[in-house]
Amino acid sequence: MQNLNSKILAIDFGTKIIGTAINDINLNLCLPYCEITNNELKFKKILEIVEEENIKEIVIGFPKTQNSYVSERHQLIIDFKNQLSELLKNKNIEICFFDESYSTKSSKESLMNFNVKTSKLKKNKDMIAASIILENYLASKK
């Protein structure tokens, strides 16, 4: 585990959209960052974020299961992590999974509590989910 005073990128992996969030080490906040279309350019965009934001650790949301069953969605996330690890192998960046159970549902509920319109809710839910994953990850390290 990296120092909690270093920048961390959280990823909420989706088959269409990848939500991201980063921590602000000065304000001790987790902030939605951007959404990335899950296509052949996704790794290029993630590498840009890593460089621009001086990321030292990446946390990828991974749905917890009651048993050891690996679904197709689990395998997609595992493959994504493996590809990302290969691309970043010379950068000394730790990549780990963290339970993302209910993060997307929680993001929708949070936005609804602030009376966010349905169209904006759909647009921002993946970034908010990544923020929730990052908040929970950081809380687990304290």
Curated annotation (Swiss-Prot):
SMART domains documented for this protein: YqgFc (SM00732)
Domain of life: Bacteria
Subcellular localization: Cytoplasm
Enzymatic class: hydrolase
Region forming the signal peptide: none
Nuclease found in the keyword field: yes
Protein name in the entry: Putative pre-16S rRNA nuclease
Gene Ontology MF terms in the entry: nuclease activity
Similarity annotation: Belongs to the YqgF nuclease family.
Pfam families: RuvX
Transmembrane segments: none
GO CC list: cytosol
EC number: 3.1.-.-
GO BP term, example: rRNA 5'-end processing
Alphabetically ordered keywords of this record: Cytoplasm, Hydrolase, Nuclease, Ribosome biogenesis
Source organism per UniProt: Malacoplasma penetrans (strain HF-2) (Mycoplasma penetrans)
Function recorded in the entry: Could be a nuclease involved in processing of the 5'-end of pre-16S rRNA.
